[in-house]
């Protein structure tokens, strides 16, 4: 059934343990007294098909900041909740065809102290779609937080993922319920596929529906033209949101990403506006320096200006590609960096008014 490789600081005396080698300094291996460079092994393993399936490509867009961008105030104060304090805010997660991060998301919310409700969006028949829309509206009208979880909605339908969810969001009934949620101080979160839907519906970066134009930002295929699944480092770029409460500009986190279309594409004029408004929430960063970067694999998809996540102008809506919900104690233990990104705790604290 396979074996487990364990690195230990002392000899293991377990009956089935077998010593296979010792760790040495440098980037080479010594096997049967023959010294082999790590780069040679990587080329032998990956070089044959690297031209067809590259593991990394030079960034197609190199600028780290739009020209003439005014500096952002280091730490902006997020808005506060004007309603009555809620000890256990209600989170609603609609589960669409292809959503696959709802369990992890619900678990993370419950751990943070929220109550969670989920519903299945059924699309087998027209009647199923209509009843699912009515069910969504009912839950959105009762919830404090609306989350669109990650996945591959409708199998990442042709010519861009997230369109199925975006079409539901733009339904007149659903859209009215979402607008009412925003007006009463509610929060909205979209991760990965959910981020794609927020962007393609106009909720990000505009904060309301019906604003999408040909010049609007979008999320496009990764530069390597295939799915990526890895850990990345992101750096905090603003604090102007309840989601980012307690963070400081420059803080870094180690976050899992898994997507085929995560490249944030935006024109220079709108990017300048996003930076100056404090709407760029997170950026891909070099783990050694903590500085934003366009270089792969640290910026795994080639996102313009190294943007990983953005917020609406009022800070109530956050969208990001990294799967913050996938970390818990005992996971990613061999990955360096701060893996606790307290988005869920911050949202709960916002409603508790603490």
Which residues fall in each region the model found?
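Short cationic amphipathic helices and targeting signals
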Residues: 1-11
